[in-house]
Amino acid sequence: HQQFHCPSAEGNQVKKVFSCKNCDKTYVSLGALKMHIRTHTLPCKCPICGKAFSRPWLLQGHIRTHTGEKPFSCQHCQSAFV
């Protein structure tokens, strides 16, 4: 963090900042910016109701609300849950 704000005397390098075009957030890596952009584009859409999500695993969990699937169970009482 300090290297970003106070470049060393030997390098005096200014790190590139990646800015989101949809909001005022900035990132020090392109990968982090790409992950953030998904919060604006919501590329994962539910085929049943159309609700959109930024991450595939969020969609996967949502689909269980339609199917009623409860993939996890208590090892003591066998009660199932999402």
UniProtKB/Swiss-Prot annotation:
SUPFAM superfamilies: beta-beta-alpha zinc fingers. A zinc finger (C2H2-type) spans 1-5, 18-40, 44-66, 72-82. Keywords: DNA-binding, Metal-binding, Nucleus, Repeat, Zinc, Zinc-finger. It is found in: Nucleus. Its main location: nucleus. InterPro entries: Snail/Krueppel_Znf, Znf_C2H2_sf, Znf_C2H2_type. Signal peptide: none annotated. GO terms for molecular function: DNA-binding transcription factor activity, RNA polymerase II-specific; RNA polymerase II cis-regulatory region sequence-specific DNA binding; zinc ion binding. SMART domains: ZnF_C2H2. One of its GO terms (cellular component) is nucleus. Belongs to the snail C2H2-type zinc-finger protein family. This is Escargot/snail protein homolog.
